[in-house]
Amino acid sequence: MTPKVFYISDGTAITAEVFGHAVLSQFPIEFEALTIPFVETIQKAQKVKQQINDCFITTGERPLVFHSIINPEIRNVIFSSECVDYDFLNTFVAPLEQHLGVQAKPLLHRTHGKSNHGYETRIDAINYTMENDDGQTMKHMDKADIILLGVSRCGKTPSSLYLSMQFGIKAANYPFTEEDMDNLKLPEALKRNKSKLFGLTIDPHRLHEIRQSRMENSRYSSLRQCRLEVKEVEMLYKKERIPFVNTTNHSVEEIATKILDITGLERHMF
């Protein structure tokens, strides 16, 4: 039977999800997960407790519960359910209080709420990235923190959005198209911002698979065209000394981490 998992919080549950995913990803099995945010009252906690207990009765196994609940009364209600409990925040808060000599003063939603000083930074970055996606405009490249380059469908847009949403980085991206291949070069707007350029590449066979699902049996999706574009773009990266990574079989999180590691871009943590 597939193990059941609950991610619970009196806030957004983002912290509980991130912690839980990081732990469970170490195990080569599938989990059935349910996220329950904003458990802010005893009444809501009692309902969640009943859900957990019902799950135990139905399956005969105690579900895993990852939570980041600040309110101790609400936390105790969840503790009393038939679950295997993993309390992310309080596991670390007490030792840190002792080490720092400072008592924690929890604020609900502090980590992901609007009150966070980085909220506007994140929103500005997301807006910038969406407005400068896929070379829609070249007018504001000077304002970018990074400009991702690559052929169509190599992962530019999801990587750009992840960088902006997760780290508040203004990430523009520019596509090299089929029409560019005869005389591939950097546009002037990119030349002016060469220090911000970062390339993405991909295995031609994987690119062929991705494009086939979008435009089957077209020149655009042919393996020959995919090989040509990847070859030409990689030659340009090397000629212009633009750093690049191969996105094949990597998640967007891994791609973004590689980009940050190579470029040394500042991460705005929220």
UniProtKB/Swiss-Prot annotation:
Catalytic activity: [pyruvate, water dikinase] + ADP = [pyruvate, water dikinase]-phosphate + AMP + H(+); [pyruvate, water dikinase]-phosphate + phosphate + H(+) = [pyruvate, water dikinase] + diphosphate
EC number from the UniProt entry: 2.7.11.33, 2.7.4.28
Residues that, per the record, bind ADP: 150-157
InterPro entries per record: Kinase-pyrophosphorylase, PSRP
Enzyme class: transferase
Keyword terms, alphabetized: Kinase, Nucleotide-binding, Serine/threonine-protein kinase, Transferase
GO function terms (MF aspect): ADP binding; ATP binding; phosphotransferase activity, phosphate group as acceptor; protein serine/threonine kinase activity
Source organism superkingdom: Bacteria
Coiled coil regions in record: none
Signal peptide: none
One Pfam family in the UniProt entry: Kinase-PPPase
Job of this protein: Bifunctional serine/threonine kinase and phosphorylase involved in the regulation of the phosphoenolpyruvate synthase (PEPS) by catalyzing its phosphorylation/dephosphorylation.
PANTHER family hit by this protein: PYRUVATE, PHOSPHATE DIKINASE REGULATORY PROTEIN 1, CHLOROPLASTIC
Official protein name in the record: Putative phosphoenolpyruvate synthase regulatory protein
Organism from which the protein derives: Shewanella frigidimarina (strain NCIMB 400)
